[in-house]
Amino acid sequence: MLPALKKGGRPRDALGRFIRHHERLPVSLADTRGVLFVVSEMADFIKAGGLGDVAAALPRALRHRYDVRVLIPGYRAVLERAGKVEIVGRVLAHAALPACDIGRIVQSDGLPIYILLSRELFERDGSPYVSTSGSEFEDNAIRFATLSHAAADIAAGHAGLGWKPRLLHLNDWPCALAAGYVRWSGGTTPCLLTIHNLAYQGLVPYSMAGALGIPAERVAELEFYGQMSFLRGGIVNADHVNTVSVSYAKQITGPAQGCGLDRLLAGRAAKGALTGIVNGIDASWDPRTDEYLDSHFSVNQWQGRQDNAAQVRKAFGLRESTGPLFAVVSRLVHQKGLDLICEVAPQIVAAGGQIAVIGGGEPDIERQVAELTRRYPGQVGAFIGFEEGLARRMFAGADFLLMPSRFEPCGLSQMYAQRFGCLPIAHATGGLIDTVDDGVTGFLFQHASVEALRRCLERAFRTFRLPGLLAAMRRAAMLRPSGWDVAGNKYLSLYERTAAIAPALATVS
């Protein structure tokens, strides 16, 4: 018999009810309509974070009912992967923002991609936002204002594409100013702004207002403690704002996580114009078929997990063990709680556990992780950097994922881990609240402190010593709905709420 969970948790039959209730939901989408999905990165071409994964997946999740087209800057990496690009339109100069051609390609699955072409602004080495040396490009304000203004021009039908979207879907600060450009020019195209991380706001000095083509009487809409914020301008002017989890949408209306925009966001929420939708994960993350795994497994056949665990231990120089294996797949930064993990590592090792770490980040935390590997050889291993195949094998072989993030707008690693039967141990914040069912599909602790994490680890060790409970939780985690079909249905409703999009089809060229 399963032990009762702690007071305030679910009753002891919660796992059975969870597994019986959660099944894949059918997607029921409306007639095809035109949506321009504006983004600064897309995993098909170039990726700096989770936004790139969303941009690759969400338009495709809606494509079979919506005429979704993506607009992305023509970075060097994009052009290298795009192949032949057809020039189909042009946006004119605006203030100091240069004129740009618009190229078009169609992905193999039929998804149209518009590429904003400017050798001066986008064809350079580095990520979308920083150079190869790690410093931000000095002209980022011009670069992403140009992207935003191009989106507004396309919405107005001024780009010569023979197509006008019924809705602009804008993502994070690099695209947020498009909502302002639409409104400032008298446009009426509905705008949805998705905030993937409120901490990045696109701050620029007031002196740039003229160069960016912001009307003098509208500059106040961007005001942020003596600077201008692209993101604030988007929040003010968008018809609706959403975040990438329900809990994060609530948390950013308060000062603790509102990043100075909490009062504005609370005002939008009070008017019903701020909501949350949890991201999905790609269907290719399937332990039965994953191309990165030598040993596959399923909810009914577990042997492959043991094989993957052995491979992970070998890859990280860990000795053979029957104890629990803890994975860390994360940027090694303070925000992700890596300092907390370093503090509790001795407790994990003393209790018979092992730790495998993959990621890179702040030099001080990298040094702390390296010191742990020296202090506990064969028990703690680390790979500074990132290699996707190794990360997937870690999810497929580890028993637990350590994810004590101080804040987390959504988070993807916990959902990847669950899909592979690896139980998250996570701080109860943002999307982690919405995706980890405490005691059912993982473990949550309420305060980002060493002591709270230690108590949560004790629960995980107790669970590991109860094979029946461990197997039931793994099965519940693997069966948890986390695909883009679920999120797609919610974006369908949000598009219709935002735009009341007319049933007429967009003109397809």
Swiss-Prot record:
Pathway: Glycan biosynthesis; glycogen biosynthesis. One of its GO terms (biological process) is glycogen biosynthetic process. GO terms for molecular function: alpha-1,4-glucan glucosyltransferase (ADP-glucose donor) activity; alpha-1,4-glucan glucosyltransferase (UDP-glucose donor) activity. It catalyses: [(1->4)-alpha-D-glucosyl](n) + ADP-alpha-D-glucose = [(1->4)-alpha-D-glucosyl](n+1) + ADP + H(+). The keyword Glycosyltransferase applies. It is an enzyme of class 2 (transferase). InterPro entries: Glyco_trans_1 (IPR001296), GS/SS (IPR011835), Starch_synth_cat_dom (IPR013534). ADP-alpha-D-glucose binds at K47. Its EC number is 2.4.1.21. CDD domains: GT5_Glycogen_synthase_DULL1-like (cd03791). Keywords: Glycogen biosynthesis, Glycosyltransferase, Transferase. Belongs to the glycosyltransferase 1 family. Bacterial/plant glycogen synthase subfamily. Synthesizes alpha-1,4-glucan chains using ADP-glucose. This is Glycogen synthase. The gene is glgA.
